[in-house]
Amino acid sequence: AWGSNLDWGFNKHPPMSAFFTEVFFKIFGSNDWAYYLLSQIFVLIAFYYVFKLANLILGNIKLSLISVLLLESIYFYNFTSPEFNVNICQLPFWSLVVYYSWKIYKSKEIEFIDCFLAGVFAAIGFLSKYLFIYLLISIGLLFIYLIFIKKIKKFDFKYLITLEVFIVLLVPHIIWLYNNEFVTIEYGLKRTGIEETNLIDHIKHPIIFLIKQIGVLIPFFFLIWI
């Protein structure tokens, strides 16, 4: 419903999940099956680029397929995947950003298109869910470590293409946030319980979260073991 009033941001989430659902609404109307299909399309795109990434790294189609099957065993790629939401929306862009980042890292001659696409998909991923920034920070720190500390790679100004594209695509959303008193960020911070004064809760809830994450990864660990 909120996708019908497209904007550069919303009270709870950045705009991309609303944008994609609105596109499907314009094509298929309010048929439930269309949104289940949309969700599975996003999951399949994620699997496809995980397969391509694994094949780049391993050079073996069989092992690359096994990589996808292992990913499929993770709770967030199976049981929760029928419902299209911000978590599903970001999945293909995780795979795409990692895939193009790997291509940039391994290429002897860095291609403009790889840097450009990495920036585009990074922006779309971030505009799907803010927590996408964790992946971007991790990749950025890794490149900084490899280039400036380990000196395995030489700095190339083409790296900045990715950053420039990312920032340019975020500008409309940043303007929207400013004009709306950063309501989306405020909502996210409230959900973290940052105002909670009970110190025990700040210890208890992370432990509970960790236990749950270990639980949902049990099938994945089991398949690796066998």
Model region roles, listed by residue range:
Residues 79-90:
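Short acidic/glycine- and proline-prone juxtamembrane loop motifs at membrane-interface regions
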Residues 67-72, 122, 126:
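Short helix- or helix-capping micro-motifs
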Residues 37-58, 95-100:
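Transmembrane-helix motifs of polytopic, lipid-linked glycan transferases
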Residues 55-58, 97-117, 226:
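Membrane-interface transmembrane helices that cradle and orient dolichyl/undecaprenyl
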Residues 5, 114-130, 141, 166-170:
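Membrane-interface alpha helices of multi-pass inner-membrane proteins
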Residues 1, 8-21, 29-34, 181:
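Extracytoplasmic catalytic/substrate-binding loops of multi-pass membrane glycan-assembly enzymes
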